[in-house]
């Protein structure tokens, strides 16, 4: 029976290579040919409908009218995304089969006049039998073909439309292009199901043959492995019988190594006892290999070897100052240690923990400390470590056991007193294999690490001469472990510090790394400051280094393309030519003063950050809503701030009954990021006052502090990081709790000079400085009048209503 035909359509045509799209099929396509991209753009400009037609030959790059099949699928474009390499990723959904009656090429893209193909009338009873058989056969095919997930069968059972069922089965079959096209051209559903069942029967036969071959190969491999094992056993027996005379030479060599290692008495006795066991064993036995490996580790570990520690304070200070700009507290602590060491023969190595955001130089500082003290440097990355055996090692009862990473690193460095960097100590975790943080308690305790016990060595090892330096991004470290370390906080760099670091270290390093010659590139201070302000917003300097590296790469490309160019100078005026548009604003969190929007300050594990808080008031019944992934403490801060506003409503010029007639919504943007803590209390209070009075908040002011029900502002933590975040953002006025005034001494001098910091005791002081116009009693009468107008309008029939200009809301 010929299929019924519906109305004609005119539609853009997209040629496909090796792909046939069926109706109801959602598939992503990557389009690279210019004509095809123009076809997609034409479809997007019209009704997002496009006809997908397969090419007869996939190798044809520029297909003509005769290179396409005549039957395709009309599809809807769900999503279109242009990729950086010029190609386009498009997500399409097949809608209905269609046959091309006339295909034309207008130079821009293919266009066709086509007509939809409708399914003919069929015998429903016969179709029901075919559907059941097809599903059953497809289930058997899935059991043999492990590449198709079982969930496909579940979704197949939920499909009621036989045509859609047939197309879904066809989409999951590994058919050739011609077979896929044949299925597409079959408008008769029964014919399509019969064709697919025949294809499935053929595929099932092939898969069964493949399974039998795979089983035969597996048996053959097992036989080969057994023969190999027996041959190796035979070789071992022959070698044991014929080469027993060579064993004493190896034992003598191990004896000499034990004597030369200068082990403590306990360790030497253990090593010699193991050597005696080895002499009694067959050299080729598995146990002999384990014992030999143990003795090798015992003689590799440095029991007595030390590197000479430098005691010249002046030289050490020069090294630290040369390698790192700023970080005075850490440098002072190292110099104190060296000063004491110059007077005391035996001093336990300090255990320092450098805590700070990424990119401030914690890891590189460990290398500089090793260089300044004359110690060898060894680093152990603890990020992701979750097995206690990584620290303590495995017992020798396990196959393939080894010492822990700690002893392995000590054996590798070869001395007893290195600088040992424990990197990312806060990134450790635990599971059923133990807690590595608990294993480190013994390592980092100066009173206990003189006798550190490794499960593999089974003897005590002295770690008291090791200088341990740990690094961490946060204080999220178990309390007992934190108590054993001397914590030194590293805050983010100021703009002046970043400028000096870039000039001294980052720029010369990237010029050398990108093979630029002397005099070929000049980057002045204005360009570096522009990068810091408008292209990075970070506590450290990693992003700054990446941007400088980008400048160097573009300079190299420019020099190679233009041979006449000998020198490139980058300044603040032409910086955007190399780095593109500015990514960040500098000077304020927003461009203008806004009602109900406040800039707060937040502390994160990677340093401080600006936190925008938004409020909105709408007519309602007193419902309070807060969004933005806020924690319990932050939600309670909002409730406390609202109570403060209600208690002072008349004084602030707010109708005391506002809570009964207004719904309030508090939102903190970046809702995917969890936020918590009480330090946004005064910011919440100010946002509510601004929203209820219509008084804008100054965009150049940021604030932090906890609010009480009495309106008092309580002290907060992380002040230095928050002030540096405001400094990075160009905020000139910062409001802080009065009791945090003492913490201002720890802030860098240049940051102090660029910021106006106001310690405040209560919300009235804070709102006087932050609101564009401080609320007055006049506003109370205005809002009372405004509420009366609203009440009158609600009860007035359709007709004349009293208007209240919104502009009056900002009057004081």
From Swiss-Prot:
Catalytic activity entry: Hydrolysis of proteins in presence of ATP
Region described as Disordered: 745-766
Subcellular location field: Cytoplasm
Keywords recorded for this protein, A-Z: ATP-binding, Cytoplasm, Hydrolase, Nucleotide-binding, Protease, Serine protease, Stress response
UniProt EC number: 3.4.21.53
Entry superkingdom: Bacteria
Entry annotated with the keyword ATP-binding: yes
Pfam family for this entry, one: Lon_lid
GO molecular function, one term: ATP-dependent peptidase activity
UniProt KW Ubl conjugation keyword: no
Domain Lon proteolytic: 592-773
Major place of residence: cytoplasm
Residues at the catalytic site: 679, 722
Basic and acidic residues: compositionally biased ranges: 745-764
Domain Lon N-terminal: 11-204
One BP term from GO: cellular response to heat
NCBIfam families reported in the protein's UniProt record: lon, PRK10787.1
Function as written in the Swiss-Prot or TrEMBL entry: ATP-dependent serine protease that mediates the selective degradation of mutant and abnormal proteins as well as certain short-lived regulatory proteins. Required for cellular homeostasis and for survival from DNA damage and developmental changes induced by stress. Degrades polypeptides processively to yield small peptide fragments that are 5 to 10 amino acids long. Binds to DNA in a double-stranded, site-specific manner. Endogenous substrates include the regulatory proteins RcsA and SulA, the transcriptional activator SoxS, and UmuD.
Subunit composition and interactions: Homohexamer. Organized in a ring with a central cavity. ATP binding and hydrolysis do not affect the oligomeric state of the enzyme.
Name assigned to this protein: Lon protease
Source organism of this protein record: Shigella dysenteriae serotype 1 (strain Sd197)
Gene coding for it: lon
């Amino acid at each position: 029976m010929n299929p019924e035909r519906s109305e004609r359509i005119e539609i853009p045509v997209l040629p496909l290579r090796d792909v046939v799209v069926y109706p109801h099929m959602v598939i992503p396509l990557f389009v690279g040919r210019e004509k095809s991209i123009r076809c997609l753009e034409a479809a997007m400009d019209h009704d997002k409908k496009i006809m997908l037609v397969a090419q007869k030959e996939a190798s044809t790059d520029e297909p003509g009218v005769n290179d396409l099949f005549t039957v395709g699928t009309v599809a809807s474009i769900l999503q279109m995304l242009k990729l950086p390499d010029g190609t386009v990723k498009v997500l399409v959904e097949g809608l209905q089969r269609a046959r091309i009656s006339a295909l034309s090429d207008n130079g821009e893209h293919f266009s066709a006049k086509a007509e939809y193909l409708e399914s003919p009338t069929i015998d429903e009873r016969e179709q029901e039998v075919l559907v059941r058989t097809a599903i059953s056969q497809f289930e058997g095919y899935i059991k043999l073909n492990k590449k198709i997930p079982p969930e496909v069968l579940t979704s197949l059972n939920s499909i009621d439309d036989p045509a859609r069922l047939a197309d879904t089965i066809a989409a999951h079959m590994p058919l050739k292009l011609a077979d896929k096209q044949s299925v597409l051209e079959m408008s008769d559903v029964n014919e399509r199901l019969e064709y697919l069942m025949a294809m499935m029967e053929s595929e099932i036969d092939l898969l069964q043959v493949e399974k039998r071959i795979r089983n035969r190969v597996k048996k053959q491999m097992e036989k080969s492995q057994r023969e190999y094992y027996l041959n190796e056993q035979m070789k071992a027996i022959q070698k044991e019988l014929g080469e027993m005379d060579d064993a004493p030479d190896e034992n003598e060599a191990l004896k000499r190594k034990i004597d030369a290692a200068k082990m403590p008495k306990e360790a030497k006795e253990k090593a010699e006892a193991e050597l005696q066991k080895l002499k009694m064993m067959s050299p080729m036995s598995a146990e002999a290999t384990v014992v030999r490996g143990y003795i090798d580790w015992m003689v590799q570990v440095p029991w007595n070897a030390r590197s000479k520690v430098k005691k010249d304070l002046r030289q050490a200070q020069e090294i630290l100052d040369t390698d790192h700009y700023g970080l005075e507290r850490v440098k002072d602590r190292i110099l104190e240690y060296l000063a004491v060491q110059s007077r005391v023969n035996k001093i336990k190595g300090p255990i320092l923990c450098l805590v700070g955001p990424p990119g401030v130089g914690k890891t590189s500082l460990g290398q500089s400390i090793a260089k300044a003290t004359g110690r060898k440097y060894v680093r152990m990355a603890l990020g992701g470590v979750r097995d206690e055996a990584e620290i303590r090692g495995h017992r020798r009862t396990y196959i393939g056991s080894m010492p822990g990473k700690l002893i392995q690193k000590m054996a590798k460095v070869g001395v007893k007193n290195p600088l040992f960097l424990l990197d990312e100590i806060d990134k450790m975790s635990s599971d059923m294999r133990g807690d590595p943080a608990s294993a480190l308690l013994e390592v980092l305790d100066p009173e206990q690490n003189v006798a550190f016990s490794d499960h593999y060595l089974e003897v005590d090892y002295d770690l008291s001469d090791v200088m341990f330096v740990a690094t961490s991004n946060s204080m999220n470290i178990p309390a007992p472990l934190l108590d054993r370390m001397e914590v030194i906080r590293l805050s983010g760099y100021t703009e002046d510090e970043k400028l000096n670091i870039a000039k001294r270290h980052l720029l010369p390093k990237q010029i050398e790394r990108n093979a630029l010659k002397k005099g070929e590139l000049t980057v002045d201070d204005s360009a570096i400051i522009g990068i810091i302000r408008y292209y990075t917003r970070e506590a450290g300097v990693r992003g700054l280094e990446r941007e400088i590296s980008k400048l160097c790469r573009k300079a190299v490309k420019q020099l190679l393309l233009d041979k006449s160019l000998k020198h490139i100078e980058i300044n603040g005026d032409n910086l955007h030519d190399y780095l593109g548009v500015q990514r960040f604003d500098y000077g304020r969190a927003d461009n203008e003063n806004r009602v109900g929007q406040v800039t707060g300050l937040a502390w994160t594990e990677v340093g401080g950050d600006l936190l925008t808080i938004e409020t909105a008031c709408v007519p309602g019944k007193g419902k309070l809503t807060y969004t933005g992934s806020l924690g319990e403490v932050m939600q309670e801060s909002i409730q406390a701030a609202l109570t403060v506003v209600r208690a002072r409503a008349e004084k602030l010029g707010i109708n005391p009954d506002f809570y009964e007639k207004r719904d309030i919504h508090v939102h903190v943007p970046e809702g995917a990021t969890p936020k918590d803590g009480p330090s946004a209390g005064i910011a919440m209070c100010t946002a509510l006052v601004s929203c209820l009075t219509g008084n804008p908040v100054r965009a150049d002011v940021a604030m932090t502090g906890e609010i009480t029900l009495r309106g008092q502002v309580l002290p907060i933590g992380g002040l230095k990081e928050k002030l540096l975040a405001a400094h990075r953002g160009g905020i000139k006025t910062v409001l802080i709790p009065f009791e945090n005034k003492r913490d201002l001494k720890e802030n860098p001098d240049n940051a102090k000079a660029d910021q106006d910091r106001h310690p405040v005791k209560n919300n009235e002081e804070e709102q006087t400085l932050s609101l564009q116009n401080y609320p007055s009693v006049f506003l109370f009468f205005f809002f009372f009048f405004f509420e009366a107008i609203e009440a009158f309008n609600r009860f007035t029939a359709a007709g004349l209503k009293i208007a209240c200009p919104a502009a009056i809301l900002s009057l004081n």
